[in-house]
């Protein structure tokens, strides 16, 4: 049985959009990370004349979200794509000739991916080391573990996992794979748990957590897509529009924070969150996975309208 799906920071996100748009306005929302469709459901219910562009790189997640939004199908346009690939040309090819006013990116990995996808995102089950968010496309985690050099493994473990045991873990992996390839999550998790002394395990966390995070980021090039996606979407956002971004770990949040702050220094953007919005105590009790979720918000001001019209006239 699958667990109940929670829309992380859903109340905060809806409140911010409500403060910036009139409830009856025909707002065009773009949900760049559809997931289970929970956030989009809030938009469709909260803004009865709105439409939602529903995007996800994973066709399985997109199908799950569409099934959840079936009662609103006339107001939803779905596009299977990574949010970093969204631009006006892509939207036009799907019959959308306007720019979104409200954009949301939820950068967290879904509960479905962790516990029900069978793609090896979690070490709690013995699953193939895959970790691809777009199934069957590109390298998988098994490729990384069994083909990357020791130095390259050490680099991604340290850079993307901030794991201080990176060198030792990389050395042991390279020696182990000479005997047998490492193909399953349980094999890798057991290997790591034997490398790090038990007394040094992080409290309440499996010692393989950081390595699994690093592998997932490497396989899916997540940080690269965040940087590229924010630039593309902020360019696409309509003047007086709002973008909200949820991040879950320090690497994501650092990119989001710096990017939004840099845009806020330019004429035409206003940072609405000097500090990130954190989930309420009530939400973290109900959904412990939300405890690390940080929400940052940027608004494109009316002063950007002249630039927006100029760029649109060039395209025409």
Swiss-Prot record:
Residues 276-316 are annotated as: Disordered. GO terms for molecular function: rRNA (cytosine-N4-)-methyltransferase activity. The keyword Kinase does not apply. The keyword Zinc-finger does not apply. InterPro entries: RsmH, SAM-dep_MeTrfase_MraW_recog, SAM-dependent_MTases_sf. S-adenosyl-L-methionine binds at residues 37-39, 56, 83, 106, 113. Its EC number is 2.1.1.199. Residues 302-316 have a biased composition (Basic and acidic residues). Keywords: Cytoplasm, Methyltransferase, rRNA processing, S-adenosyl-L-methionine, Transferase. It catalyses: cytidine(1402) in 16S rRNA + S-adenosyl-L-methionine = N(4)-methylcytidine(1402) in 16S rRNA + S-adenosyl-L-homocysteine + H(+). One of its GO terms (biological process) is rRNA base methylation. Pfam families: Methyltransf_5. It is found in: Cytoplasm. GO terms for cellular component: cytoplasm. Specifically methylates the N4 position of cytidine in position 1402 (C1402) of 16S rRNA. Belongs to the methyltransferase superfamily. RsmH family. HAMAP family: 16SrRNA_methyltr_H. This is Ribosomal RNA small subunit methyltransferase H. The gene is rsmH.
């Amino acid at each position: 049985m699958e667990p109940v799906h929670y829309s992380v920071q859903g109340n905060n996100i809806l409140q911010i959009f409500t403060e910036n748009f009139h409830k009856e306005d025909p707002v065009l929302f773009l949900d760049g990370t559809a997931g289970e469709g929970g956030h989009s459901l809030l938009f469709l219910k909260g803004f009865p004349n709105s439409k939602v562009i529903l995007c996800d790189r994973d066709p399985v997640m997109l199908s799950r979200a569409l099934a959840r939004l079936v009662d609103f199908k006339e107001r939803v346009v779905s596009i299977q794509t990574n949010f970093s690939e969204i631009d006006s040309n892509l939207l036009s090819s799907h019959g959308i000739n306007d720019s979104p006013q409200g954009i949301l990116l939820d950068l967290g990995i879904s509960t479905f991916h962790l516990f029900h996808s069978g793609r090896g995102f979690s070490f709690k089950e013995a699953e193939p080391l895959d970790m691809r968010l777009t199934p069957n496309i590109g390298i998988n985690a098994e490729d990384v573990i069994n083909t990357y050099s020791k130095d390259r493994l050490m680099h991604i473990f340290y850079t993307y996992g901030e794991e201080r045991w990176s060198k030792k873990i990389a050395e042991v992996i390279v020696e182990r794979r000479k005997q047998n390839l490492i193909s399953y999550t349980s094999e890798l998790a057991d290997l790591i748990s034997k490398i790090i002394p038990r007394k040094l395990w992080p409290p309440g966390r499996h010692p393989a957590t950081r390595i699994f995070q690093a592998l997932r980021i490497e396989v899916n090039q997540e940080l690269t897509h965040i940087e590229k996606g924010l630039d593309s979407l902020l360019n696409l956002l309509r003047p007086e529009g709002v973008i909200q971004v949820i991040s879950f770990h320090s690497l994501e949040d650092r990119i989001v924070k710096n990017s939004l702050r840099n845009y806020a220094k330019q004429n035409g953007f206003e940072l609405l969150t000097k500090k990130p919005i954190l989930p309420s105590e009530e939400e973290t009790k109900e959904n412990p996975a939300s405890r690390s979720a940080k929400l940052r918000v940027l608004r494109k001001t009316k002063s950007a309208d002249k630039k927006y019209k100029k760029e649109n006239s060039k395209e025409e």
